[in-house]
């Protein structure tokens, strides 16, 4: 698994074919157009076949609740993987436009297949790139309608070292507004210490943050943290 984690940072996949197998499993077993069934089938694969690194069912309920609090018209996810997080966002905010940024074309292709099967590909879009690519992806998002004060919700679930610089890039564009919510997964494991320290320093000034104690995806032994932060402006 250690080799798989190293693969994640370069290819976006664990490296043993489980992501493609998960997509095939979903298309074979989940009802078309049924978001609940697609999500449950991904969870079933992760529990019974091969562990996946999407946010998962336990932490997914925290994500769902935060999305509902934000009630977004426009949502952004960083780190698509299989499209699971974006699918949960789309389910919790059925009127929202959801954009997901992913570094790996293979993951983008897998996610698009899952979104099409779930019936949400008309409002969930994958943009291949990274926020730290010199502005290309940020400019692409601008072409999709991202503008000053339009971004209601952000889900960070990509390279943990990129959480803080990528959030700063979003802030520099002015897309957030007072009341926008940012959720960050895996803040304890693998860990995003600089991001967590930033949110602690900014508590009550630029951000109001709740730290949710939970577990790493698809097991109950390893503790994790999900941070939910409301932007104060």
UniProtKB/Swiss-Prot annotation:
The keyword Transferase applies. CDD domains: AdoMet_MTases. Keywords: Metal-binding, Methyltransferase, S-adenosyl-L-methionine, Transferase. One of its GO terms (biological process) is methylation. One of its GO terms (molecular function) is metal ion binding. SUPFAM superfamilies: S-adenosyl-L-methionine-dependent methyltransferases. Its EC number is 2.1.1.-. The keyword Transferase applies. S-adenosyl-L-methionine binds at residues 55, 77, 79-80, 102, 159. It is an enzyme of class 2 (transferase). A divalent metal cation binds at residues 157, 185-186. Belongs to the class I-like SAM-binding methyltransferase superfamily. Cation-dependent O-methyltransferase family. Specifically methylates an O atom of its substrate. This is Probable O-methyltransferase Rv1703c.
